Structure formats: structure tokens, C-alpha cells
Amino acid sequence: MRSHLVKPGSVYDGIEPGELGETTESVQDRVRQLESRNSFLEEQCSQIESEKRYLENQKIKYEREIRKLQSELDRMKTSPLIIGTVIDVIKNDRIIVRSSNGPQFLVNVSQYIDEKKLLPGAKVALNQHTLAIAEVIPSTEEPFVAAMEVIESVEVDYDQIGGLDEQIQELQEAVELPLTSPERFARIGIEPPKGVLLYGLPGTGKTLLAKAVAHRTNATFIRVVGSELVQKYIGDGSKLVREIFEMARKKAPSIIFIDELDSIAARRLNETTGADREVQRTLMQLLAEMDGFDKRKNIRIIAATNRPDVLDPAILRPGRFDRLVHVPMPGIEARGKILKIHCEKMTLAEDIDFKKLAKATEGMSGADLKAIATEAGMFAVRRDKELVEMEEFLEAVEKVSMAADTQKMMPSNLPETMFV
């Protein structure tokens, strides 16, 4: 029986009611499947788009890396430039330069270079083929020279130096006052000393005095050991001397301290080897730099040596080292002061007699007295004591005395012709 709802001739004509319900459910199920499939495809499409963007970013990154590596490769393939020095500046962008090989050339200048930087003495880079000036090399301090400048404050003051009051006064007058109160010298009408030479036996406090000057002054303090100026290749020692004094001029007021001066300023002899001639070149450069000072330059020189007898007479004349300060071995009162200074931070017993210790240390230097204080403390540590007593100091005096006697005996027992 046909349903009264189905019109004759319609699309549902001839379909039973049960069959019509099944068809609707299958269509709805198919729609749900298609919607689910569509959602899945949309998610896949979104994921693919995300991967596409990531790959495009990676492509840009790798292309940038390729360009960077290609640029580095091209730079590595570029011909090196020759280092030269400007000798003279001529009109019409023409410069006379000396190459690193020695000969001089008249060359052109790139239009992109500031002509104000092209001064005689300036370092420039030259094209390998045309020798045209490609760039001006900025002046830099030699790292070896820059390391000689004392940056950190030295914790040594004059009150920590015993028995050298006269030497401290002479050092203050010759080094500190010209830098801190130059008007005093101008008022009297004299030029302050340009250099001070400290000489004396080892361990008497020469380097300690220089450290105290570094602590008391706000000037740039440049410390040089004489042996550092002795270089392997010809001209390197003279170059170091020039650069040290150039740094002192740039950072004035400044103090140059040359320790172990005898290593480069020994007396010049007629018979010399190649190494001796190089040391003499360094000495002559040092003499020239010291003569180049004038009263307008706030630069002072302190030197120390324990062999004044071997120094060249040229370096001892007035105008170079105007003041020679002898640092003697400490006397009995000075030894007592030095021992008290070195024992300030030590935990001492009440029976310590510094006068007795000063008498027992006859002929000892300040360095020996410091060693005595250290050894006395070591004896107390060994015995697990709370205080350092007189007993430890007497044992320390005996130990340091034996070491000093052994050291004195060693060179005297060697034959004079041993190293000939």
C-alpha cells in the first residue's frame, strides 16, 4: 500500500517507507564521513602550510649562510696588502711611502681615505700590485708594552718602609713634587730632576721604594725590567723603548720604573758580539729618549740596580739621572723598625725584644728581615702555638743567617777561569 504522503510521479514514488528511512540514514552517515574527511584534510593542509613556512625560513637561513661563507671565501682569496709608512705628503693626492721591504715609492691615494690621517709616520696598507694606499692603519699600543702599565693600586706606602727616611725624602723631592707641585720649582727658577737612580745591595728596598711611589702618586706608573728590553731580532729592543716612552707621553703625568738597569746599560766595550751590539742599540735609544724630555713633559724616570760599577758613564751624567740615591744596608735602629713593620699583623708574645733581634741581625738586609719574620711564624705553626715567641725568632735568625752564609760562599769558591 502506498503512503498517502507520497505523490504520484515524485522521486519517492515506488519506494517503500522502510526503504526511504534507510536511504536518509545512509546519506547522513555519508555527510558525516565527508565532514570528518574535510576536517582531516583541513588539518593536513594547515600542517603542510606550517611546514612550508618552516622550510622557507630554513631556505632563507641557509642562503644567508651561503652568502656569508662565500664572502669569507672571497675575502680569504683576496691578495694581502703590504704594510708601509708615510714619509712625505705631496699635492695632488700623491704620497711618498716606505714599504716594509725598505724602498720608497711615490703612490696614489684612494679617494675614500681621509687626507687628514695621512701624516708622516702613519702606518698604511698598500695594494700589492699598484702600491696605492688602500687604508690607514690605526696606531695601537704593543700588547707587551701595554702590559707594563701598573693598573692596580700597589699596597705599599712609605710608612711600611723602615730606616730609609733620607732616601724617601730625596725620592719625594725628585719624583712626586715635580708632578704634584710644579709651581714650587717654577717659583725658584730651576728644573726638577728628570731621573733618579736607586743603587744598593740586593734586598735593601729599592723596588719597595718604587712601589711606594706608585701608591702615593696618581700618575701612570710603567714598570719595566731591563732584561725585557733585550730582544732577539735587531731593532726590536729599540722599538720597545720608543713605544714605552710614547705611551708615557700619551698618559702623562707618568713615571717609568726600570728595574735591573745594568742588564741594558752596562759599560760599552770595543770588542763586542752581535748580541752585545743589539744591547748597545737599545741603550742608545734609551739615552736618546731620556735626552728628548723637556720641562713641559710630566714624565719622570726611576731606575734601580745593584751593580752601579758596571753602568755606562753616559747614562749617569746630569740630565739623564740627575739624582743618584744610595740605598744602604739597614743599621741597628732601621733593622728594629723593619722587623716591627713585618710583624704588625703577627700574633706575638709579650717577650719579643726587637732591640735584641736588631743586634742579632747585623749585616742583614730588609729582605732577610722579612724572611726572619716569616720563618718565625712557620716555627710557631709547626708547633701549633697560639703566639709567636722569642724562641721562634731566635731560631729564625739562625736559619736565615746560615742560608745567607751559604749563598755568600757559593760564588767565592768558584774558580775565576771557570766561565772563560
Swiss-Prot record:
Residues 22-79 form a coiled coil. SUPFAM superfamilies: P-loop containing nucleoside triphosphate hydrolases. One of its GO terms (cellular component) is cytoplasm. GO terms for biological process: proteasomal protein catabolic process; protein unfolding. Keywords: ATP-binding, Chaperone, Coiled coil, Cytoplasm, Nucleotide-binding, Proteasome. Residues 418-420 are annotated as: Docks into pockets in the proteasome alpha-ring to cause gate opening. The keyword ATP-binding applies. One of its GO terms (molecular function) is ATP hydrolysis activity. InterPro entries: 26S_Proteasome_ATPase, AAA+_ATPase, AAA_lid_3, ATPase_AAA_core, ATPase_AAA_CS, NA-bd_OB-fold, Nucleotidase_PAN, P-loop_NTPase. The keyword Nucleotide-binding applies. ATP binds at G203, T204, G205, K206, T207, L208, H342. It comes from the Archaea. Residues 1-25 are annotated as: Disordered. It is found in: Cytoplasm. ATPase which is responsible for recognizing, binding, unfolding and translocation of substrate proteins into the archaeal 20S proteasome core particle. Is essential for opening the gate of the 20S proteasome via an interaction with its C-terminus, thereby allowing substrate entry and access to the site of proteolysis. Thus, the C-termini of the proteasomal ATPase function like a 'key in a lock' to induce gate opening and therefore regulate proteolysis. Consists of three main regions, an N-terminal coiled-coil domain that may assist in substrate recognition, an interdomain involved in PAN hexamerization, and a C-terminal ATPase domain of the AAA type. Belongs to the AAA ATPase family. Homohexamer. The hexameric complex has a two-ring architecture resembling a top hat that caps the 20S proteasome core at one or both ends. Upon ATP-binding, the C-terminus of PAN interacts with the alpha-rings of the proteasome core by binding to the intersubunit pockets. This is Proteasome-activating nucleotidase. The gene is pan.
